[in-house]
């Protein structure tokens, strides 16, 4: 699995990959999650920080859990370091 620059980018990649694996368009995912297609597009581009309630809605529409999406994103992002 390739690593991405931030957790937001990694989450965007995970959501996009899951959506395409399920054969869903952005519009269908948005409809199923009760969100606007432009918002889903922005999430997949990494343009938006996704809120918890929207992450849960997207996860349900993708037939998975928010925690599973986050775990996959965390595995793809570089470890954070504290200073």
Language-model regions: role of each:
Residues 1-10, 79-80:
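A detector for short, charged/polar N-terminal pre-domain segments
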Residues 13-32:
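Short basic helix-loop element that most often maps to the first helix and adjoining turn
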Residues 15, 29-30, 40-43, 69:
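Conserved hydrophobic/aromatic packing and binding residues within compact polymer-binding modules
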Residues 34-48:
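Recognition helix of helix-turn-helix/homeodomain-like DNA-binding domains
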Residues 53-68:
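DNA major-groove recognition helix of helix-turn-helix/homeodomain DNA-binding modules
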Residues 70-83:
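Short, charged recognition helix plus adjacent turn
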